[in-house]
Amino acid sequence: MSFFNPPANSNHGYNDDVNTGYNARMHSKLAEREGFHLGNGSDEPRTLYVGNLDSTVTEDFIATLFNQIGSVTKTKVIFDGSNDPYAFVEFSDHGQASQALQTMNKRLLLDREMKVNWAVEPGQQQSKIDTTRHFHVFVGDLSSEVDNQKLREAFQPFGDVSDAKVIRDTNTTKSKGYGFVSYPKREEAERAIEQMNGQWLGRRTIRTNWATRKPGDQEKPSHYNEKSYDEIYNQTSGDNTSVYVGNIASLTEDEIRQGFASFGRITEVRIFKMQGYAFVKFDNKDAAAKAIVQMNNQDVGGQLVRCSWGKTGDTGKTPGGSYGYGYGNSSSGGNSQPYSGYGGGGAYGGGQGGGGHGGPGQQQSNANSQYWQYYAQYYNNPQLMQQWSNYWQQQGGAPQQQNSGGHQ
């Protein structure tokens, strides 16, 4: 007879259809009545339900077994006569309880498969843990077969993984080849980054790095960060979710996503290498505003980036047109502002007001005029000036500056 065997496959206990005998509502009430810590609100649970036990088990036996995983503070075995005995096991913290859940669920104990789950109210066990102040690790070059579970398992040896997510295309659900792993402790994330970089996961070697600046790091001085969230939020229309990111130099899409992923779901990243900027589009305005407030003049992949609102140019919409990004003058005739518009043929999107550029089927001469105007508008930016100077040297010289009227 086998005393204690590992499980045939991994299972984390959540929504476990084979976890017969477990009743979340009933067992959570019983655990609460016995004085176990279940957690509520921001207080994370640390008590487990352990079911399908042999009738010979004792509280000392269960406590000794689970103490191999973490510090057990309380144990109670329930014998109700009509069903197999079950137990509640409380740990000193959520991380140890989570590790025990993943390690012990479906293990054979006295030839019986243990059923381990959180002893919490229905729905509470699936509530998302707030990882805002946790430490986030970017994982790149993931092979297509790696899912959330495999990602979590690969990084579990380095600490209590609070979240693991493979980023997928919203239309095809296929993996985009990267993901994020979160830890509540800095040293756990640092250890994972150091030891997992270049390791094999699935069919490929992976890259690891910080997903964004680490919580608790000193903020770099920034006059922009002196503005409040409300000020930034109210600077643009209610449906704007586009963030302009300047000074990106040679940053890749992965690196930009790393830097901004912690603020919310990113729906699109468009990069304009020659101009030295990108647009990051979020699925809601709140996430975009937070990104601007916190990331302006912050380090992303070794670059100190500048962040402000992108501006959606609806006047550039054309049937069947694709996204185009560029700079246009505001309708008020004020300073130029970066915007993300809809343009034809993947060229530069139409701007607002008299200084707009865009439209399908533009000729090369018009395109050259556009380049010149972008250069002229941002003549006071030394980095952009150097980029354009290099470009025109390659083109054999800059064209004569056009009048300020728009090009249609």
From Swiss-Prot:
Checking Pfam families in the record gives:
RRM_1
Q: In which tissues is it expressed?
A: Expressed in the germline and also in somatic tissues. Expressed in Ggonads and oocytes. Expression is slightly reduced in the most proximal oocytes, especially the -1 oocyte. Aggregates mostly in the head neurons, muscles, intestine, vulval and hypodermal cells during heat shock. Expressed only in the intestine as a response to heat shock, starvation and dietary restriction.
Please list the GO biological process terms of this entry. Answer: determination of adult lifespan; nematode larval development; nuclear-transcribed mRNA catabolic process, nonsense-mediated decay; regulation of locomotion; regulation of mRNA stability; reproductive process; response to oxidative stress; response to UV
What are the recorded GO MF terms, alphabetically? mRNA binding
**Highest taxon in the source lineage:** Eukaryota
The residue ranges of the RRM domain are 46-121, 135-213, 241-312
Its localization reads: Cytoplasm; Nucleus; Cytoplasm, Stress granule
Q: Name one GO cellular component term.
A: cytoplasmic stress granule
Give the disruption phenotype, in one or two sentences: Reduced lifespan, impaired stress response, delayed development, reduced brood size and an early behavioral decline with uncoordinated locomotion at 6 days of adulthood. Have smaller brood size and 10% embryonic lethality at 20 degrees Celsius. Produces 2 to 35-fold excess males at 20 and 25 degrees Celsius, probably due to increased X-chromosome non-disjunction during oogenesis. Shows impaired heat-shock response: only a 3-fold increase in phsp-16.2 expression (thermotolerance biomarker) when heat-shocked compared to a 10-fold increase in wild-type animals.
What are the record keywords, sorted?
Cytoplasm, Nucleus, Repeat, RNA-binding, Stress response
Q: What role does it play?
A: Acts downstream of ced-9 in the induction of germline apoptosis under different stress conditions including starvation, osmotic, oxidative, heat shock and UV stress. Plays a role in the formation of stress granules in response to heat shock and oxidative stress but not in response to osmotic stress. Required for the formation of stress granules in the core gonad but may not play a critical role in this process in the oocytes. Plays an important role in the formation of stress granules in the embryo. Protects female germ cells and embryos from heat shock.
Q: What is this protein called?
A: Cytotoxic granule-associated RNA binding protein tiar-1
Q: Which organism is it from?
A: Caenorhabditis elegans
